[in-house]
């Protein structure tokens, strides 16, 4: 790696900004290097389900931005959560309120998915997906299914037939398989049409299941989908650094209070926002593909979403530093 590199300001296509005081604490880390960030809708106590919710959450984020000192503009890209009760009218109203995408959490697979989608093929949901297609909204999917006698490490693979069904049924709907974690998911996205893409996180480029449970329980590495085998991680690194435009950054940065992680039943999520560009630069440098980092972080996601490139750049300097243990 050169002592200094410049990147166009990032597009982080998967961010958990939270609400309230935690929002104000974590938002500055992403805003310092990103021009845009997709705001995930599975917030609590108020989930983002309607156009009214979109307006409320965007205003919350912008108020938090107004309270921090940042030199460059940051745009939150809003989403709604798609549930079995979501209707085409709700889709239309959310789009008019500024939502660029709808996010599906299958029932019970991750944080705050207790009211997640049960039936991907119901007529009501199909009508909602058609409304998203007609409006130009994207469908973002947490691609796991919790089935009887299915290990947590197999949930993503079990979901892939559903992805295939959706891609074939809605060829004009842009679909993003979020935070892919397995070789088979990467292969599936590559084989499907140009309407299907995937995000990759920094932590899935670095961790395996051993880093979660192999050397004692390490709760701050626990997330959904779980990191998998070495072959899966190697595949993710290879495709992220390959220059394939179907794969781009979505950090899934997910902050939790420390006591919510270090407990008998800890929350899932890895908080990477404070170190995201640095970790990605190390990964790309290790495989000799630092020249492709900007495409992964700042080009391919924008192109898939139909957005112009961000203005401005950030600079990374190669030097030793100590990551704070907590913020």
Protein language model features and the residues they cover:
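His/Asp/Glu-enriched, well-ordered alpha-helical/loop segment
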Residues: 242-309
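C-terminal cap of metal-dependent C-N hydrolases
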Residues: 311-327
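Histidine-centered catalytic micro-motifs
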Residues: 9-20, 139-145, 200, 251-253
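Histidine/acidic residue-rich metal-binding segments in metalloenzymes
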Residues: 90-104, 113-249
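Short helix-capping segments at alpha-helix termini
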Residues: 63-73, 168-170, 193-194, 289
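Divalent metal-dependent hydrolysis catalytic cores, especially in the metallo-beta-lactamase
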Residues: 12-13, 26-52, 70-83, 99-112, ...
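Short, acidic/polar
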Residues: 20-27, 85-96
């Amino acid at each position: 790696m050169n002592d200094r590199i410049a990147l166009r300001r990032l597009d982080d296509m998967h961010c958990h900004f939270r609400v309230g005081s935690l929002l104000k604490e974590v938002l500055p880390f992403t805003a310092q290097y990103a021009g845009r960030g997709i705001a995930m809708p599975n917030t609590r106590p108020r989930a983002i389900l309607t156009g009214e919710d979109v307006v409320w959450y965007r205003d919350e984020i912008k108020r938090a931005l107004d309270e921090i000192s940042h030199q460059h503009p940051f745009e939150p890209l809003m989403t709604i959560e798609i549930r079995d009760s979501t209707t085409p009218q709700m889709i239309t109203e959310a789009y008019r309120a500024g939502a660029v995408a709808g996010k599906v959490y299958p029932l019970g697979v991750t944080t705050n998915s207790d009211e997640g989608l049960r039936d991907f093929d119901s007529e009501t949901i199909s009508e909602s997906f058609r409304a998203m297609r007609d409006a130009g909204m994207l469908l973002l999917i947490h691609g796991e299914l919790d089935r009887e006698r299915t290990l947590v490490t197999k949930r993503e693979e079990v979901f892939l037939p559903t992805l295939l069904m959706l891609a074939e049924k809605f060829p004009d709907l842009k679909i993003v398989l979020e935070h892919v974690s397995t070789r088979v998911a990467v292969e599936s996205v590559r084989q499907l049409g140009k309407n299907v893409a995937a995000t990759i996180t920094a932590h899935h480029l670095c961790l395996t299941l051993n880093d979660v449970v192999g050397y004692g329980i390490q709760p701050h590495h626990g997330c959904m989908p779980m990191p998998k085998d070495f072959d899966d991680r190697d595949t993710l690194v290879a495709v992220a650094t390959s220059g394939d435009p179907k794969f781009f950054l979505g950090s899934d940065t997910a902050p939790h209070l420390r006591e919510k992680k270090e407990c008998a039943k800890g929350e899932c999520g890895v908080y990477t926002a404070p170190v995201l560009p640095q970790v990605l630069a190390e990964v790309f440098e290790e495989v000799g593909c630092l020249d492709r980092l900007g495409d992964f972080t700042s080009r391919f996601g924008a192109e898939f979403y139909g957005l112009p490139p961000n203005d401005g750049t950030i600079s990374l300097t190669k030097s030793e530093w100590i990551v704070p243990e907590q913020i």
